[in-house]
Amino acid sequence: MRNKKIFFWRTVCIIAFVVVLISFKTQSEGIALGSITVSEDDRPAQWQNIIAKEFNIDRIKLIVDNKEIQLNKADILIDENKNIMIPAYIFPDTFNCAFNAFDDTSVTLQKGNIIAILDTNNSYITVDGQSITMDKALVKKNDMTYINALVLKEAFGYQYNWSVTDNKLEMINNKKSENILPHRYSYRDTKRMLSIKNQGNTSSCWAFASLTALETSIMPAQNTELSVNNMVCNNGYVNTLNDGGDYTRAIAYLTAWRGPVSEADDIYCDSIYDVSSNPVKHIQEVQIIESKNLEEIKKAVFLHGGVESSLYTSMNEHDRSSIYYNNETYAYCYNGTKKPNHDIVIIGWDDNYPKSNFSVDTEADGAFICMNSWGSGFGDEGFFYVSYYDTNIGVHNVVYTGIEDANNYDNIYQSDICGWVGQLGYESDTAFFSNVYTASENETLQAVGFYATDKNTSYDIYVVENFSDVSSFEQIKYIQSGEFKNAGYYTVNLKQEIDMEAGKKYAVVIKIKTPDAVHPIAIEYAAGKATKNVILDDGEGYISYTGNSWEHVEESKGCNICLKMYTKNM
């Protein structure tokens, strides 16, 4: 008994001592306690673990180039050796680093022409062929990959400071003036490639291009083949493999969670399609890049995935002759005025690709490296070059930037299966819109999803709890604000989750501002044969110019509002 008491009080004293240590500022040579400094070498290993756990209790704030970065999926960690581990998923958008390779034990990062290779089995990293000693450059914890902050310092020139007092990591890019994009980049070079597909004698290039772009965005972490058949036939539109389509149908299908479905579950050109197959991913964000913004297109390919774009061509899968195509150099450039009629995927670029390789005169060198859906017999095993100066390449551009596991939310509330068909507004760049939904179970509202119909769109999000009629809009509660750089579909995670009671109505309200727009609200309606099956009695949507007087759009406009809610069950 006496020994147990001694052990108990000894444990209490050690814990109290460590807590006191943590309360003082960590110095470079150790932890200061009054006038005494306990060096790292003299600290027991148990202390290091306790200290690390203490730092990780509170979320570590990340500031990069004086801007706070929001971490949604995972937080920064401090390990027992005070290594600062940053979740890998933020590297493309936060640090402009591309993942050329990614698996459970190794990662290849690229920024500009600098390439860094990290491996969990090595006590060093390789930067442009040179080894730099570094313990724990890469770790995996709770199915999340983390990269040591030292990698950013040693490989890409970042300076950083961790404030113990504020629990804050500040990082500064000392190489801001350097171009993040190399002069040439291609998924073929980085081995981030899929097998070339063949649409055959159908008009489904739009679906092949959409899903190929999506598949490359899922890579290099995962390699999966997705069902074109399901996208074409299960998207809410009146559609067959020969009817054609465009990226808006693809976005509607994916953001409605009807797909993407595995190719193994719904094979291409099968006579029937499977409505029961579950999506293998949930698509939460799709960006539409500004027309002819070549640098932003390259950046999207570099950081996220292939960019779906379009061409005009008189060629097809069977007839590959054209005055605009050089069969010997696999180079294409159309300089006429006809609108696009074929979708492809941009998977790279070469700024120095000679203009002499094209069969028509072009302004200068430079070409996108593109992937077609006419089988490996076309071009260079299915790939070809399209001049930067082609009339249509880069006019319509789509990249999938928000791809999450299919268990991210439990429920989706929506009334716009066909997605963004048209737009509403009040001849102004600003408007309010809302959808009202009845909670099926006791749930928490965690996120909302809606379209930005053009670039630089800003928004305010509000919620109305226990909605009954339009008078309930007087009780709107402000949640948060934000801005989108590009047009597209976006999911916004709410900073304040809302508890929802089964059977009660809840309204999400968006105030949107899209510069130079006159109709900034995306809507679904029956615009023709393809959308004739649009259902209006599944939604309760409203619009307002000022937020004071509201109009029920299903009744007055014959349309649905494109505004979704995402919830989790309690």
Where are these regions (language model features)?
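Short proline/glycine- and polar residue-rich coil/turn motifs
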Residues: S481-G488, M500
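Short, surface-exposed beta-strand/loop patches at domain edges
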Residues: K511-M570
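Noncatalytic modules at the cell exterior or secretory-pathway interfaces
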Residues: I498-I512
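Primary recognition of N-terminal secretory signal peptides and signal-anchoring hydrophobic helices
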Residues: F24-H183
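N-terminal secretory signal peptides that target proteins for export/translocation
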Residues: M1-K4
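Sec-dependent N-terminal signal peptides of Gram-positive bacterial secreted proteins and lipoproteins
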Residues: I6-E29
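Exposed aromatic-hydrophobic patches
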Residues: Y489-E497
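Catalytic-core signature of thiol
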Residues: N173-Q446, Y451-G482, G503, I521-G528
